[in-house]
């Protein structure tokens, strides 16, 4: 009996070695939207973008106003002059992303992870950053200009950032 188990194990190992099962995991390119593209002046306003990913893209003057972008991802992207007024970016990720001259008014960033992202010359009036994770330097910059209350959540922008 001992030899039969050993022989069965050896046969199984040989079969797996000679005929390995194929990998079924998705590659990152199959789940990324618009990787490496330049998306200047595109209009995504009011659209359902739940779970969309933008990786290494230039989004100049792109309109995301009032879009449902929950769980979305910006990774290594440049958002210059974008309109994100009223966007819902709850549970989203913005990593190594540059927000430059962006309209983030009345946007919802609750539970968003926005580490190593930079916010230069942005308007965050009425934006809700409740439980969002941002770098300390960026929080200080945003607190210097934070004002208003989000029209949908009723949360004060300064309070959501933890400004003193």
List PLM regions with ranges:
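Tandem repeat scaffolds
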Residues: 2-8, 13-14, 21-164
């Amino acid at each position: 009996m001992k030899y039969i188990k050993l022989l069965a194990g050896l046969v199984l190992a040989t079969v797996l070695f000679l005929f390995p099962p194929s990998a079924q995991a998705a590659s990152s390119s199959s789940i990324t939207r618009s990787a490496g593209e330049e998306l200047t002046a595109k209009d995504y306003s009011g659209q359902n973008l739940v779970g969309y990913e933008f990786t290494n893209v230039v989004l100049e003057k792109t309109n995301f106003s009032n879009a449902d972008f929950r769980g979305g991802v910006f990774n290594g992207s440049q958002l210059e002059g974008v309109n994100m007024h009223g966007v819902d970016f709850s549970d989203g990720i913005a990593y190594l992303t540059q927000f430059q001259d962006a309209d983030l008014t009345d946007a919802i960033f609750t539970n968003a992870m926005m580490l190593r992202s930079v916010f230069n010359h942005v308007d965050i009036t009425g934006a809700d950053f409740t439980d969002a994770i941002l770098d300390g330097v960026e929080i200080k910059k945003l607190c210097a200009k934070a004002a208003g209350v989000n029209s949908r959540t009723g949360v004060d922008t300064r309070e959501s950032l933890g400004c003193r």
